[in-house]
């Protein structure tokens, strides 16, 4: 089955994959950013920490629901949940980052070799989830149109610290036609579990971003004339916090390479 799915992937249309099919191809070694994959299903960020630091991070997420909206928590040593019923959190994301004392140690497609039974995993909502709603309402999503990863930036917006964890918020940016900015705000505000409405619209310097062409994570996108940069809180914030707070060990998804869950995006939509 995995070979068949990989073959389909190379023929295009990853948006038609079920979450199980997408996880299979990533488990088989395909590395790709996941924007546009498995349309209609929620995507998620991952941070995995030793159990002794798990409560501090849980408190950090509770104090910072905009960048860290929790969709689920896996207990120490647990590798699957109802969000990925047949899955394995250690192998079903296309690319992982392993941090040691705040430093990026490696970027790998599988973390089973470094897995420990004391590790607690946090599954955090991702804004890729609401991109289907934007597209269905005629709002363009430039990084998908350009075949790129979404650009992400560290900002001057502080987070609320908890225990050992503190650091700046990370945001994702999508250039939106000026006449459709209000639509983008209205549509995404209905998805609070996957970052919700933007945190900033317009001048990037106002939130500490000096150059949109030089993102801290992801890829720069061409910004069409007549568009305005719109910024959403981003679930890469925990990686920024890991780099700032320097825990002994952490596993995260590589930015833009998300966990595709079995949850429908409509489950996270509010009226």
Curated annotation (Swiss-Prot):
Gene3D superfamilies registered for this protein in UniProt: PSTPO5379-like, PSTPO5379-like domain
Keyword tags: Lyase
GO molecular function annotation: lyase activity
EC number assigned by the record: 4.2.1.-
InterPro entries linked to this entry: D-Glu_cyclase (IPR009906), Putative_hydro-lyase (IPR038021), UPF0317 (IPR016938)
Superkingdom to which the source organism belongs: Bacteria
Keyword Lyase: yes
Matches recorded under SUPFAM superfamilies: PSTPO5379-like
Alphabetical list of Pfam families matching this protein: D-Glu_cyclase
Enzyme class: lyase
HAMAP family: Hydro_lyase
Family label: Belongs to the D-glutamate cyclase family.
Annotated protein name in UniProt: Putative hydro-lyase jk0403
């Amino acid at each position: 089955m995995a070979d068949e799915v990989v073959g389909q992937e190379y023929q295009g249309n990853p948006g038609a994959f079920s979450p199980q099919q997408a996880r299979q191809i990533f488990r088989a070694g395909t590395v790709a950013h996941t924007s546009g994959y498995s349309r209609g299903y929620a995507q998620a960020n991952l941070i995995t920490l030793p159990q002794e630091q798990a409560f501090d991070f849980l408190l950090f997420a509770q104090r910072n629901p905009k960048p860290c909206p929790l969709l689920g928590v896996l207990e120490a040593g647990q590798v699957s949940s109802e969000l990925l019923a047949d899955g394995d959190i250690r192998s079903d994301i296309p690319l992982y980052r392993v941090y040691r004392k705040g430093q990026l140690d490696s970027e790998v497609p599988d973390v089973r070799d470094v897995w420990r039974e004391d590790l607690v995993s946090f599954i955090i909502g991702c804004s890729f989830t609401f991109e289907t709603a934007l597209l269905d309402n005629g709002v363009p999503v430039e990084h998908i149109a350009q075949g790129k990863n979404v650009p992400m930036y560290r900002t001057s917006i502080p987070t609320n610290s908890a225990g050992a964890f503190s650091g700046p918020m990370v945001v994702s940016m999508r250039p939106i036609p000026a006449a459709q900015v209000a639509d983008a705000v209205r549509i995404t505000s209905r998805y609070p579990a996957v970052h919700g409405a933007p945190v900033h619209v317009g001048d990037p310097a106002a939130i500490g971003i000096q150059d949109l062409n030089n993102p801290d994570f992801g890829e720069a996108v061409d910004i069409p004339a007549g568009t305005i940069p719109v910024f959403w809180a981003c679930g890469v914030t925990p990686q920024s916090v890991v780099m700032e707070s320097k825990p002994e060990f952490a596993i995260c998804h590589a930015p833009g390479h998300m966990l595709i869950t079995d949850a429908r995006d409509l489950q996270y939509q509010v009226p």
